[in-house]
Amino acid sequence: MTDFDKPRESCGIFGICDHPEAAPITYFGLYALQHRGQESAGIATIRGDTIIEHKGMGLVSDVFDMSHLNVLEGRSAVGHVRYSTTGSSVLTNAQPFLVRHRKKSYAVAHNGNIVNAHTLKDELEESGSIFQTTMDSEIFLHLFVKNLEYGFEQALVKSVSRLQGAFSFVMLTSLGEIIGIKDPYGFRPLCLGKLNGSYVLASETCAFDLVEAEFVRELDPGEIVIIGPAGIKSIKTSPATRRAFCTFEYI
């Protein structure tokens, strides 16, 4: 079995829902989060009823120019900058990670580590899953797709409940929804903001400052937020009995 990536202290994630300049705003959000990752950068957005993306190796300013942003024309977007370390530094492992399932698309950007990744991957491969990367992030999408038989919200809850570790996710659906997920310990940061009536999610509030978004709150430990054109819904899963923090988040 191919080993997963080595642990990363931090990556940067950003998402915005229902804004006419979603991709350019995500670009600037990632630019503000560049200190969290310099290995690769990517943005996913919607075209019609599917998700398209552009990603590459290097800094945000190296990966994107106006021609790329003009193609990424959807009203919702998620983005990712990846922490640089030795090993697995290949474009295949750049995020957001995109999957298509039964005429729908999902793209996920992930910060953190899933410590039971090997066990879950073995289980998923035994049941027929085929992995395209060495990212533990991909495990979440495989779990999510398998749990969709229980409905969209329960698929999120059931999938997150299987994960152990320190993590936060932003996910884009082909319906234009943005989902934010925070681990039960609240180990990895994820902030909620507003920009001219649109909701934004980011690893740090410095991304809000650059795009002139208003900070609303930090997501609670174990919280899932589902953001669509009609508004926002919060799902509180079971948080850990104590909150934990990552020392690297305070450097």
PLM feature spans:
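Conserved short alpha-helical segments that host acidic/polar catalytic motifs at enzyme active sites
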Residues: M1-I251
